[in-house]
């Protein structure tokens, strides 16, 4: 499994949400629709992240 550089924030925390939002916007051109999926289902977003190696 791909491990992001740096300390992983606790899932569900404010820091965690900010972290995945930043990664989502950094890859907005590659997966714009995943941002909307992530808003409703963070678990799905994390799966997508692992698959596309954000």
Curated annotation (Swiss-Prot):
Protein name, as recorded: Protein YojO
UniProt family annotation: Belongs to the YojO family.
Top-level taxon: Bacteria
């Amino acid at each position: 499994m791909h491990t992001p550089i740096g300390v992983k924030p606790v899932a569900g925390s404010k820091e965690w949400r900010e972290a995945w939002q930043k990664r989502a916007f950094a890859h907005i051109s590659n997966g714009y629709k995943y941002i909307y999926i992530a808003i409703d289902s963070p678990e799905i977003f994390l799966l997508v992240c692992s698959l596309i190696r954000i």
